[in-house]
């Protein structure tokens, strides 16, 4: 294996995936949320640079091509499981997350079944946009969980209406509130909208891969 900089970035991104979960094991919230968000964003940035540098420096390799989608899937799956757990099992989050996880398992199974023919299921531009949408949505959802925990601390038992009045009166920290429902609500709803968009792209790309693999799934007569 060639330990080029692009390959090292890919390996680091793969290691960052379980690292996001580790943040919640060793740190209390909201620090765990902020550390997980920071680590996730840094890892997501490497997803752009490893491929870009590999093409720029002509260091593309089979190892990098194999590991890159695995690192992406590991990041997305682990992060979504964590966010879903800390969201209180919000059904508006569970549905798109279930679709995303099902698609990832399904496509991975297709690739394994096709074996040498798996090269037919090349990563498309739409699939890259799908991954980007997933990562942006996850980052915003992590932001929402962190802000929600901070606002819970800042409110100290107040209702949102009481908290909003306290902010207006200068008796509460305005940085932790964007109005009646707080910053976390805006971040969470934006993240949910993006994760539904990502789920739609996930379904479309999954169907495209299945359509391409279908001729090889028929029994020979």
From Swiss-Prot:
Q: Does the keyword Transferase apply?
A: yes
The Enzyme Commission number assigned here is 2.7.8.5
Q: How does it sit in the membrane?
A: Multi-pass membrane protein
Q: Which residues cross the membrane?
A: 8-28, 34-54, 75-95, 133-153, 187-207
Q: In which pathway does it act?
A: Phospholipid metabolism; phosphatidylglycerol biosynthesis; phosphatidylglycerol from CDP-diacylglycerol: step 1/2
Which InterPro entries does its entry note? CDP-alcohol_PTase-I, CDP-OH_P_trans, CDP-OH_PTrfase_TM_dom, CDP_ALCOHOL_P_TRANSF_CS, Phosphatidylglycerol_P_synth
PROSITE patterns with a match to the protein in the record: CDP_ALCOHOL_P_TRANSF
Query: Is Membrane among this UniProt entry's keywords?
Result: yes
Query: Might you name a Gene Ontology BP term for this protein?
Result: phosphatidylglycerol biosynthetic process
Reaction(s) catalysed (UniProt annotation): a CDP-1,2-diacyl-sn-glycerol + sn-glycerol 3-phosphate = a 1,2-diacyl-sn-glycero-3-phospho-(1'-sn-glycero-3'-phosphate) + CMP + H(+)
Q: Where in the cell is it found?
A: Cell membrane
Entry's Gene Ontology molecular function annotations: CDP-diacylglycerol-glycerol-3-phosphate 3-phosphatidyltransferase activity
Q: Would you indicate the residue range of the signal peptide?
A: none
Q: Which domain of life is it from?
A: Bacteria
Question: Which EC class heads this enzyme's classification?
Answer: transferase
User: Keywords assigned by UniProt?
Assistant: Cell membrane, Lipid biosynthesis, Lipid metabolism, Membrane, Phospholipid biosynthesis, Phospholipid metabolism, Transferase, Transmembrane, Transmembrane helix
Checking Pfam families in the record gives: CDP-OH_P_transf
Identify the GO cellular component terms for this protein: plasma membrane
Q: Can you tell me which family this protein belongs to?
A: Belongs to the CDP-alcohol phosphatidyltransferase class-I family.
Write out the function statement from the record.
This protein catalyzes the committed step to the synthesis of the acidic phospholipids.
Q: What is this protein called?
A: CDP-diacylglycerol--glycerol-3-phosphate 3-phosphatidyltransferase
Q: Which organism is it from?
A: Cereibacter sphaeroides (strain ATCC 17023 / DSM 158 / JCM 6121 / CCUG 31486 / LMG 2827 / NBRC 12203 / NCIMB 8253 / ATH 2.4.1.)
Q: What is the lineage of its organism?
A: Bacteria, Pseudomonadati, Pseudomonadota, Alphaproteobacteria, Rhodobacterales
